[in-house]
Amino acid sequence: MNHATQRVAIVTGASRGIGAAIAERLAADGFTVIINYSGNPAPADELVGKIEQRGGRALSVKADVSDAAAVAGLFDSAEQAFGGVDVLVNNAGVIALAPVADMRDEDADRLLDINLKGSFNAMREAAKRLRDNGRIINFSSSVVGLLQPGYGMYAASKAAIEALTSVLAKELRGRNITVNAVAPGPTATGLFLDGKTPELIERLAKMAPLERLGTPDDIAAAVAFLAGADGGWINGQTLRANGGII
């Protein structure tokens, strides 16, 4: 694929974990990838180097998705470097767990600012600036269906994403842009594993009929399907990539 026809994908929160796996997979599939990060640039820059060593094209761009102006700047950078954007993968997110009665205001605000408002900011920008025949892929979570104690605010922030996904898919009628969400189950990332005992991790791994945790590559494969030609008839849906946990 030559550079003039290469499709361009923005992946938010892409410097590590699931986001990094998505960036690598999309680059392997022929996409130019914008690797968004919000903190330390080193992992994002390292990932750019890895993709370029394999013959791909990538650019790291710092932006806090909870800041609408920063998200607009993220799209500006992509357009200036590569001429436009075809795919948005709304991967950036945080987690904070507590029973509803014990949830701190600052934790609730951060969940809503990043998981909901951050995803909304990127969706809004993509709705205005994505090229026709594009893809918007949001991130929900399988906790929306599991409804576990302690996950209330986190699940709420992700349930809202599923609603926005279905609505935006209808609002973009006529442009051949699909809007879907991926809802991972327990996945072996640092974000998921940190603070958990080996016994708890083993118990969580056994919850799904496939009796293992998901991997970042499992989730990246689901995203790649939705971003590619084979996923073109899927629209307004949430794909639950969780090994059958629900």
Show the residue positions of the predicted features.
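Short C-terminal tail/terminal secondary-structure segment
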Residues: 146, 206, 224, 235-246
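Substrate-binding pocket helix/loop in short-chain dehydrogenase/reductase
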Residues: 99-100, 104-112, 192, 200, ...
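Active-site helix of classical SDR
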Residues: 123, 157
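Alpha-helical segment proximal to the catalytic Tyr-Lys
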Residues: 128-129, 170-174, 232
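Conserved glycine-rich Rossmann-like NAD(P)H-binding loop of the short-chain dehydrogenase/reductase
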Residues: 29-46
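Conserved glycine-rich cofactor-binding loop
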Residues: 15-16
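Active-site loop-to-helix junction immediately N-terminal to the catalytic Tyr of the SDR YXXXK motif
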Residues: 95, 103, 147-155, 167
